[in-house]
């Protein structure tokens, strides 16, 4: 009697059930990517322009986030934010109900803060890779520093950073499986892998 290595009927039957969790996975990844792009851009600018206090805070933020595992950050978000909000309620007399906050919000916070730290380094490296003479040339023809940055430097930096953003998005899709630890059932959680 010959045994079958893979049960293809079971795989086909299960595929539809697993795909039902795909919107949650994509939702986490896309929302995280959008907000991370925005936050990481400002973190990168703060570090490049060496704004006194803000630059130091951005450096500490990037170092801390990149030095701790995402799983720890999810737990800190999931257990820490409610504690902070309860403390703020008691301290300032607010009436915020922490129990009404959906769990996915804590996942978004952890993922956005994590991805922003990594993507800020991508932004920073991409901006610094554009030669300074291009900024100087733009300023010499009458552009302000912000105009030169917006019209000359950032478009080139974005092209340089785009492959890294793609890699970050792929990694983010994989990382969404960690949301299962706080009971968000996404693609891998649904598959029980």
Name the predicted role of every residue range:
Residues 1-193:
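Transmembrane alpha-helices and adjacent helix-loop boundaries
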């Amino acid at each position: 009697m010959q045994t079958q290595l893979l049960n293809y009927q079971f795989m086909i039957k299960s595929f539809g059930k697993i795909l039902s969790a795909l919107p949650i996975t994509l939702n986490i990844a896309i929302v995280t990517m959008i907000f991370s792009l925005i936050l990481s851009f400002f973190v990168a600018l703060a570090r490049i322009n060496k704004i006194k206090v803000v630059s130091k805070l951005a450096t500490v933020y990037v170092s801390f986030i990149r030095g701790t595992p995402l799983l720890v950050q999810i737990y800190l978000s999931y257990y820490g934010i409610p504690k902070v909000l309860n403390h703020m309620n008691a301290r300032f007399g607010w009436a915020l109900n922490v129990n009404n906050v959906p769990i996915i919000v804590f996942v978004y916070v952890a993922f956005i803060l994590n991805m922003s730290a990594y993507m800020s380094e991508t932004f920073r490296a991409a901006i610094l890779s554009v030669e300074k003479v291009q900024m100087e040339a733009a300023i010499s023809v009458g552009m302000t520093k912000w105009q030169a940055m917006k019209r000359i430097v950032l478009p080139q930096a974005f092209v340089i950073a785009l492959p890294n953003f793609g890699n970050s998005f792929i990694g983010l899709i994989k990382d969404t499986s960690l949301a299962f630890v706080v009971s968000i059932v996404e693609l891998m959680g649904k598959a029980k892998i």
